[in-house]
From Swiss-Prot:
Protein name listed in UniProt: Flagellar L-ring protein
Assembly description: The basal body constitutes a major portion of the flagellar organelle and consists of four rings (L,P,S, and M) mounted on a central rod.
Function: Assembles around the rod to form the L-ring and probably protects the motor/basal body from shearing forces during rotation.
Lineage summary: Bacteria, Pseudomonadati, Pseudomonadota, Betaproteobacteria, Burkholderiales
Organism expressing this protein natively: Burkholderia pseudomallei (strain K96243)
Top-level taxon: Bacteria
Keyword annotations of the record: Bacterial flagellum, Cell outer membrane, Membrane, Signal
PANTHER family: FLAGELLAR L-RING PROTEIN (PTHR34933:SF3)
Length: 240
């Protein structure tokens, strides 16, 4: 005999809710995964690391003479220009770049062909008069242009992270500013010739080799300028 058992209404609701939980959990996990793809992390273009600590000086000794090998300061008759790992240097950013490019192309070709077939005798009734002619023309014209202007002025203090065998200094540093819930930062890295450093312990960015300057931000404004993950998805698969 087949038995049918009816569950109370609260029990049926609880069982239905339990059956829906795995699907809801999977949907929530998928939503979180897609939300994580909404913001693509931007890798810095500057050379890492951004700072370096000077090496530890040797242990202090007291031999009783004027010369002390454990002295970590600068010599008396030495200038204050950076020359060791951990020294700091001020970079005066003065970048002004203008670029203009224009191009054009023009092509024109024409052709004309005519072929007459005279007929005589018994061929006259078959072909009568046959005139063959063909004409063709091909014309192409295109123009293009592009222009760009970039200006960046400011100052940033960097740290010597390495000293090359020829004496050039590898510098790198960053400056962060938190303004109205937006974190803005400036990063700089490059190779400096010590001979170009001024008496104020500064050098222009135009005199730095392999200079890499980055100005970016993190916050609501930066997120508003970023395309959403769903829009990027349809942009990649759209055929037009």
């Amino acid at each position: 005999m087949k038995q049918v058992r009816f569950l109370p209404q609260p029990a049926r609701r609880a069982r239905a809710a339990a059956a829906r939980r795995p699907g809801a959990a999977a949907l929530a996990a998928a939503a979180l995964a897609l939300a994580g793809c909404a913001q693509i992390p931007r890798e810095p273009i500057t050379q890492q690391p951004m700072s370096a600590m000077p090496p530890m000086p040797p242990a202090m000794q007291a031999p009783g003479s004027i010369y002390n090998p454990g002295y970590a300061g600068r010599p008396l008759f030495e200038d204050q220009r950076p020359r060791n790992v951990g020294d700091i240097l001020t970079i005066v950013i003065a970048e002004n770049i203008n670029a203009t490019k224009s191009s054009g192309a023009n092509t024109n070709r024409q052709g004309n062909t005519s072929f007459d077939v005279p007929t005589a005798g018994f061929l006259g009734g078959l072909f009568n008069k046959a005139n063959l002619s063909a004409q063709g023309a091909n014309k192409f014209a295109a123009t293009g242009g592009a222009s760009a202007a970039n200006t960046f002025n400011g100052t940033i203090t960097v740290t010597v992270t390495n000293v090359l065998p020829n004496g050039n200094l590898v510098v790198s540093g960053e400056k962060q500013m938190l303004i109205n819930q937006g974190n803005e930062f400036v990063r700089f890295s490059g190779i400096v010739n010590p001979n170009t450093i001024s008496g104020q312990n500064s050098v222009y960015s135009t005199q730095v080799a392999d200079a890499r300057i980055e100005y970016s931000a993190k916050g609501y404004i930066n997120e508003a300028e970023t395309m959403g993950w769903l829009q990027r998805f349809f942009l990649n698969i759209a055929p037009w």
